[in-house]
Regions:
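Conserved hydrophobic/aromatic beta-strand scaffold that supports enzyme active sites
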Residues: 5-7, 76, 176
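Structural motif
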Residues: 129, 147, 151-152
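Acetyl-CoA-dependent GNAT
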Residues: 40-112, 116-129, 159-162, 178-188
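Short glycine/proline-centered loop/turn elements that form peptide/ligand docking sites
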Residues: 119, 142-145, 162-168
Length: 188
């Protein structure tokens, strides 16, 4: 048998992917680190979803907007951490593309990979529906969101003039961004 360092023999170092699968590390810390799997949003989630949306958006969706999205059958998911709402996303499946209508993560949980997890989930749902890509709009003034989407492979494909409400009754353009995803069973 070849000699190997202790950290290799005893597997004390783990990759991020291994840690997210629950391997290695302090077992008491695992529940706090594991982001969980998005679950379908229900009417019972709406109070928390509306509160989170109001906390993170300058011009938030209303309870009626969320209820209408659920009633229309849009893909709507919540992500919980230790029973508490951490984030959510809503996607409308069009004939050729999934349209990400809204995505949000609790500000206290930013920079922990939860937004990426939700975005990956939306992309996976698009693949499973046989769609070619995910489309979204984002405010140009939201530089952190624009950067986030670019880091995740989204490209700007257009601009929607006057799309968003803005301060003092004005309007703000939207950057239209899209990422192509291979449909489930298709060659990437």
């Amino acid at each position: 048998e070849l000699a190997a360092p202790l950290y290799v023999r005893d597997k004390v170092a783990f990759t991020t992917a291994e840690r997210l699968r629950g391997e290695g590390g302090n077992p008491k810390a695992r529940p706090a680190l594991a982001p969980g799997v998005p679950q379908p949003m229900t009417d019972a989630d709406l109070d928390e979803v509306v509160a989170l949306e109001a906390h993170v958006q300058a011009f938030p969706w209303t309870r009626g907007n969320f209820a209408d999205a659920l009633a229309a059958g849009y893909g709507a998911w919540v992500l919980r951490r230790e029973g508490r709402l951490a984030g959510f996303c809503i996607v409308m499946h069009a004939p050729d593309v999934a349209h990400l209508l809204v995505i949000a993560v609790d500000k206290a949980l930013h920079r922990q990979g939860l937004g990426g997890l939700l975005l990956d989930w939306c992309e996976q749902q698009a693949r499973e529906h046989g769609l070619e890509g995910v489309l979204l709009e984002v405010r140009p003034s939201n530089a952190s969101a624009v950067s986030f989407y670019k880091r995740h492979g989204y490209l700007q494909i257009g601009v929607r003039r006057g799309y968003y409400p803005a301060e003092k009754g004005g309007r703000e353009d939207a950057l239209v961004m899209q990422k192509r995803v291979a449909a489930a069973g298709a060659a990437a």
